[in-house]
């Protein structure tokens, strides 16, 4: 990270959990330098509720922000998001939070859209980028857990809730679900992670952009990569070895991959059957049928993708990764590729070419 680049740590409290429809009621943000030292004035804003969207009662209970409080302290949404955009759009800013790419960034995008502003430009123009500490934290738990206290849920798996991590590691958090308290707590977690393994922190930071992570992809050799994602679940340490097999046919930010921890039995099945099982909701799959181990990774969402060297030296064993099994599955995929050089990639791409989505009602 160059000396001129900065992180802008931020968090929203909202009227509900649907980022596409629910509204931001509180925002907090603060800027740090590359050393995670605060260099700007903290910013806290409220937005007035809008009459076209009722708040969810659970959101009021969790955040403690009532419609009356938001109305009293809040700005009109257009002024609210304009002030936020002013910070996030500063050149060479990396917007970051905890679960920010999946939630907070979507809140920002939709608020900008409702205000007739460009929803995306601030994420990539003028040397800007975005990052998310949640998957970084998952990567540390799997790959470099030493030096950090990892809270455990009732089901025996690690809790990645921000308030649980701060409590376990003696980090002051103030009032959880207060936007500024969450921002400060996130910065302190980042400092802890970096102290424990600066190399992993800096590596993940360098590879947060689409261009950087694309450089790891080798479709010609079918080179496997380490992928960390909450989609794999606690039983798998939120990690899998995957092999990129094709680019999405219509979205060049999406990479089609196969999970090497699962058998590639789908290679023997007709494409229409594979497609049916791939996009059928889990609860509706026939008994005894597993979803094909094929997924897309969105490279413009700062995914954690690393070379397999990161699971060398006993790390794979600690994660329960069966090297022989993974090599066997990779060999089957490479054999299928060698048998049909032209059709191998096309077959994966065709799974998404006929994809349809149910209509969404109001």
Q: For the regions a protein language model found, what residue spans apply to each?
A:
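Short hydrophobic beta-strand that contains or immediately precedes a catalytic carboxylate
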Residues: 9-11, 259
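Metal-dependent phosphoesterase core characteristic of DEDDh/y 3'-5' exonuclease domains
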Residues: 21-27, 31-65, 86-199, 204
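Conserved DEDDh/DEDDy metal-dependent 3′-5′ exonuclease domain
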Residues: 62-145, 305-361
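Conserved beta-strand and immediately adjacent loop positions that scaffold enzyme active sites
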Residues: 6, 26-28, 254-256
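Acidic catalytic cores of enzymes that act on phosphate-bearing nucleotides/polynucleotides
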Residues: 206-283
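Short acidic, Gly/Ser-rich segments with clustered Asp/Glu that frequently serve as metal-coordination loops
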Residues: 13-20
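Extended alpha-helical coiled-coil/bundle linker/stalk regions that scaffold oligomerization
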Residues: 251-330
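N-terminal accessory regions of nucleic-acid-interacting proteins
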Residues: 1-7
